[in-house]
A protein has these predicted regions:
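Conserved ATP-binding subdomain of kinase catalytic cores across diverse folds
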Residues: 1-131, 157, 161
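Conserved kinase catalytic-core segment
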Residues: 142-165
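Active-site oxyanion-binding pockets that recognize sulfate/phosphate
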Residues: 81-84, 138-142
Length: 165
C-alpha cells in the first residue's frame, strides 16, 4: 500500500511508525490503522472540502465558531481565505468535540493528538483484537439490545450536558 501524503508527514515527524492498512473511508475522512511504537492506533485523515461528497454541508457546519471578525467576514464572503478558514474551523471543531466528549466521560476513542490535519486516536477493537464492528453489523438478542440501549442513553445524556447534541 502506498502511504498517503498526510500520513507520510506523521511518519517523517516520528508521530507514527507505519501505516498498516486502510480501515474505512467515508464522506468526511479516511481512517487508517497505524503503528506508533508498540501501539496499534488509527489515524483519521480529513478530506479537503473539494473531496468531500456529502450534500448538506451548510447545515452540517452551521454554528461553527471562528477566531475573529476577519475570518468571519472572509467566510461570509466565501473568499479563498474564507474557505480555508472554514475548513480549519470545521476540522478543529471535530477534534475539540472528541476531547470534550472524552473529558465528559463519554465512551469515545482516546485521542492521541491532532497533527497536520490528521487525528491520531486509539483503535477500538473487539476481544480478539480485531477492529470493532459497526453497530449496524452487530446482532443482539433482546436482552442485550435493552442493556446496550440503556448504556447508549446514558452516553447521550452526557453529550447533551456538553451541549454537543
Amino acid at each position: 500500500m502506498k502511504t498517503p501524503a498526510a500520513l507520510q508527514a506523521l511518519i517523517d515527524d516520528g508521530v507514527i511508525d507505519e501505516v498498516l492498512r486502510p480501515l474505512k473511508s467515508g464522506k468526511e475522512a479516511a481512517v487508517y490503522v497505524v503503528r506508533s511504537g508498540d501501539d496499534i492506533r488509527c489515524a483519521k485523515v480529513y478530506k479537503d472540502m473539494a473531496q468531500r461528497s456529502f450534500q448538506q454541508r451548510v447545515q452540517y457546519q452551521e454554528g461553527r465558531k471562528v477566531r475573529g471578525s476577519r475570518e468571519a467576514r472572509a467566510i461570509g464572503k466565501a473568499t479563498k481565505y474564507g474557505r480555508k478558514q472554514q475548513e480549519t474551523a470545521w476540522k478543529n471543531a471535530e477534534v475539540d468535540a472528541l476531547y470534550l466528549l472524552r473529558d465528559a466521560g463519554v465512551r469515545v476513542p482516546e485521542p492521541h493528538g491532532y497533527y497536520h490535519g490528521v487525528l491520531v486516536m486509539a483503535l477500538v477493537t473487539d476481544a480478539d483484537g480485531f477492529s470493532a464492528p459497526r453497530l449496524g453489523e452487530v446482532e443482539l438478542d433482546p436482552d442485550q439490545a435493552r442493556d446496550f440501549h440503556a448504556v447508549l442513553m446514558r452516553q447521550v445524556v452526557r453529550m447533551l450536558c456538553c451541549g454537543l447534541i
